[in-house]
């Protein structure tokens, strides 16, 4: 791979508390899974370098709290996102019902074009007993199809068994890069560094 500018991409991961957002991140970044549940307070993020189409990409994966009392912080954490992942638990119908609320909250806070901005919907915890499943694959796909014209992809995964986790984040990386590339490329693209410490020539006689 030839030397070239590193691309930084921000990915926001949303969903109700306890659906496994942190577990998916840790499995992808650290290849670790913990059975212990610890609620995310506010937001946290992990980074991982990946190569997409011969480009070096640093993914910033933002894990946001699912509790309602932290949703007011959304604008600060959503700003600058290149892709949004919304996670639900296939064994919890309520968490799936919340998917559209999370999507609308993100769109409201960021003013993104809902037809163009990439969303990935993830049904997590498919490793559990199938008899306990509350959200069928058919139901989830029907939801995605109902958003005509939207840039939305659905995955099912298991953070515990590392099922589809790599494929999921490879798709996230590709969609985020495509979205970033579609915007005007003016950030960090100067031929020379800006010398902010250089004094300005003051030709004004005003002392104010």
From Swiss-Prot:
| Stored InterPro entries | P-loop_NTPase, Small_GTP-bd, Small_GTPase
Give the UniProt record's GO annotations in the biological process aspect: endocytosis; Golgi to vacuole transport; intracellular protein transport; negative regulation of TORC1 signaling; negative regulation of vacuole fusion, non-autophagic; regulation of vacuole fusion, non-autophagic
Activity modulation comment: Rab activation is generally mediated by a guanine exchange factor (GEF), while inactivation through hydrolysis of bound GTP is catalyzed by a GTPase activating protein (GAP).
GO cellular component, as recorded? cytosol; fungal-type vacuole membrane; late endosome; nucleus; vacuolar membrane; vacuole
For this protein, the record's SMART domains field holds: RAB, RAN, RAS, RHO
Its main subcellular localisation, reduced to a broad class, is membrane
**Do the record's keywords include Secreted?**
no
Write out the GO MF terms: GTP binding; GTPase activity
Q: Where is this motif: Effector region?
A: 37-45
Q: Give lipid-anchored residues (S-geranylgeranyl cysteine).
A: 206, 208
Out of the domains of life, which is the source?
Answer: Eukaryota
* Residues engaged in binding GTP: 17-23, 33-40, 66, 124-127, 158-160
Q: Which residues carry this modification: Cysteine methyl ester?
A: 208
Mind telling me which CDD domains this protein's record contains? Rab7
Keywords from the UniProt entry: GTP-binding, Lipoprotein, Membrane, Methylation, Nucleotide-binding, Prenylation, Protein transport, Transport, Vacuole
Effects seen without this gene: Contains large vacuoles.
The subcellular location is: Vacuole membrane
Coiled coil feature spans: none
Task: Give the similarity note.
Answer: Belongs to the small GTPase superfamily. Rab family.
The record's NCBIfam families line, in alphabetical order, gives: small_GTP
Give the protein's function.
Answer: Ypt/Rab-type GTPases are key regulators of membrane trafficking and intracellular vesicular transport. They act as molecular switches that convert between GTP-bound and GDP-bound states, and regulate virtually all steps of membrane traffic from the formation of the transport vesicle at the donor membrane to its fusion at the target membrane. In the GDP-bound state, Ypt proteins are predominantly cytosolic, solubilized through the interaction with a GDP dissociation inhibitor (GDI).
By what name is this protein known? Ypt/Rab-type GTPase ypt71
Record the organism. Schizosaccharomyces pombe (strain 972 / ATCC 24843)
Lineage here is: Eukaryota, Fungi, Dikarya, Ascomycota, Taphrinomycotina
């Amino acid at each position: 791979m030839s030397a070239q500018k590193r691309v930084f991409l921000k990915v926001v991961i949303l969903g109700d508390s306890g659906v496994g957002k942190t577990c998916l991140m840790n499995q992808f970044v650290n290849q670790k899974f913990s059975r212990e549940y610890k609620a995310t307070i506010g937001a946290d993020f992990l980074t991982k370098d990946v190569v997409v189409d011969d480009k070096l990409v640093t993914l910033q994966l933002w894990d946001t709290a699912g509790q309602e009392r932290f949703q007011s912080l959304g604008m600060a954490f959503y700003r600058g996102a290149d892709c949004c992942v919304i996670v639900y638990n296939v064994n919890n119908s309520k968490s799936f019902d919340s998917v559209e609320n999370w999507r609308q909250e993100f769109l409201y806070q960021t003013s993104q074009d809902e037809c163009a901005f990439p969303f990935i919907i993830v049904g997590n915890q498919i490793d559990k007993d199938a008899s306990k499943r509350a959200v069928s694959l058919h139901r989830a796909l029907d939801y995605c199809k109902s958003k005509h014209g939207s840039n939305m992809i659905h995955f099912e995964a298991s953070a515990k068994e590392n099922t589809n986790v790599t494929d999921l984040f490879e798709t996230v990386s590709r969609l985020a890069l495509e979205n970033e590339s579609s915007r005007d490329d003016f950030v960090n693209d100067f031929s020379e560094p800006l010398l902010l410490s250089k004094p300005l020539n003051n030709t004004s006689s005003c002392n104010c």
